[in-house]
A protein has these predicted regions:
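Pepsin/retropepsin-fold aspartyl endopeptidases
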Residues: 21-328
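Bacterial N-terminal signal peptides
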Residues: 9-20
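Bacterial N-terminal signal peptides that target proteins for export
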Residues: 1-10
Length: 328
């Protein structure tokens, strides 16, 4: 009998869950909401499970509603192994995928195919990563899985953390009618400022470049992180004071690490200046090893829900833009 061929793909899942964190305020609608509705986009409500401040939503896998974490820090969409069997995903036994938690430990997963529906948008033959069963609590173990960048691109979804929604092309939108691709391109009318994102080299993860105290810094934009985290390896070079906390970071493999806290001043992204920004600090060696900006520099950290909420940000991962502030 011919032995199956196993393909190993490597990716880093930067999805983070933090314990003992404060509450995150949720913004309202406004001009952006009205413009998206006028464009024919429909809103998909998101929610939060008990004990977790991050956003998740119910999406259909082969017609079955499952609750997924919305995680732009993951390049792939995964689903629990038991639920993959229950929903009838077609398993590809020739593929094995190796992923890593943000702290570096490897996770071996499989591949399965089935339909994924977010709102009225359907990807009929979507490639899911099959997450193995395990007894260790991870950053996604309370969910059926996580919706990553591949699903956001496949459905044309925009992530609106401040209002707790996703937006997808509706049946009467230009995209829904098949008159244009799912990528919007730049739309200055969706925010006060439009910040261009780049990818992390060969990886699809989204990088936002800026400066801190006049020095270049770059960050992974991660809707699956409760709070923003700066790599200790980078932070310590700025000689900024910090203090220890009782909070711990839990990554996708279940590993935990204590956090420090600091306050940053003069964090700038293009024309957007953030005069004061609170940040958590943790060693992020694996993240810096695999994620580099366009100049080849290792990334300096992860921008999470706190940054997106405070900045009233809308993420268009497919087009590579982050819209900051309500449009005028």
């Amino acid at each position: 009998m011919r032995r199956p061929f196993f393909h190993f793909a490597s990716a880093l899942l930067a999805c983070l869950f933090l314990t003992q964190c404060g509450s995150i305020p949720v913004g309202g609608g406004g001009a952006r909401t009205k413009r998206l509705e006028k464009m024919g986009y429909e809103s998909v409500p998101l929610g939060k499970i008990a004990g977790d401040k991050r956003y998740s939503g119910f999406f259909l896998v082969n017609g079955t509603p499952l609750q997924f974490l919305v995680d732009s820090g993951a390049n792939r969409t995964d689903v629990d192994e038991a639920l993959a069997e229950k929903t009838g995903l077609r398993i590809d036994h020739s593929v094995r995928i190796v992923t890593r938690g943000a702290l570096g430990r490897e996770i071996h997963s499989g591949r399965g195919f089935g339909s994924l529906q977010i709102g009225s948008m359907i990807s009929p033959d979507f490639p899911f990563t099959i997450a193995p069963r395990g007894g260790v609590k991870t950053s996604t173990s309370s969910y059926a899985g996580q919706v990553g960048l591949d699903a956001l691109s496949a459905t044309g979804a925009l992530v609106d953390i401040p209002t707790g929604k996703m937006w997808v092309p509706g049946p009467n939108s230009t995209q829904g009618l098949g008159r244009a691709g799912l990528r919007l391109g730049v739309r200055p009318d969706l925010g006060n400022k439009a910040l261009r994102l780049e990818t992390a080299g060969r990886l699809p993860h989204l990088i936002l470049k800026g400066t801190l105290n006049g020095r270049p810094v770059s960050w992974v934009v991660d809707t699956g992180a409760e709070v923003s985290v700066m790599a200790a390896e980078s932070f310590d070079s700025f000689n900024i004071p910090s203090r220890n906390t009782n909070s711990r970071m839990i990554d996708a493999s279940g590993d935990r690490i204590p956090l420090r806290h600091a306050r940053l001043y003069n964090l700038t992204f293009g024309e957007v200046n953030i005069s004061v920004f609170d940040i958590s600090i943790a060693p992020l060696g694996p993240v810096r090893k695999y994620f580099h900006d366009g100049s080849g520099r290792p990334v300096d950290g992860i921008l999470g829900m706190d940054f997106l909420t405070t900045g009233s940000a809308l993420l268009d991962s497919g087009s590579g833009f982050l819209y900051m502030g309500e449009p005028r």
